[in-house]
Amino acid sequence: MKYLSVLALLLFTGQAIAADGPLVEKVRKANDRFKDVKVAIAEGYAPIPCASGLTGGAMGIHYVNGDLLKSGKVDVEHPQAIMYEPQAGGKLDLIAVEYIAFKGPASLEGHLFNFVSEPNRYGLDKFYEMHVWAWRENPTGAFADMNPKVSCDAALSP
């Protein structure tokens, strides 16, 4: 009973987030270079429009590397997509990365990817993906697709 009380306290206070902490921290350290979007562009990433959630929140602007997408490799240091939230004045804030594989089930460091069937909003064949919100806290989880704390509003502004 004592352990259940401690677990309940940890869950209630939000301190139990550490369960996904090691991978999030590893991803952050391996990809911090992408805070400067020029680095992403130099490494072959190109932008696709900001992706908003159907029921709120967003994923942000994805910078996708076609060569990494085709490679089929899952490597913590080379995500297939890098995600930025647009800010006023055109600034982009690094918020997350996305790992994508067309064969699966796919995983990274023991974390299984989500399966995306076809047809899908991206017009792609079925695939597996995992977002890692390493630079922006996500109340729905560090590996959730959408983040209610992210917006595409600045991308839509003139």
For the regions a language model picked out, list residue spans one by one.
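Primary mode marks residue(s) on the alpha4-beta5-alpha5 output face of response regulator receiver
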Residues: 19-158
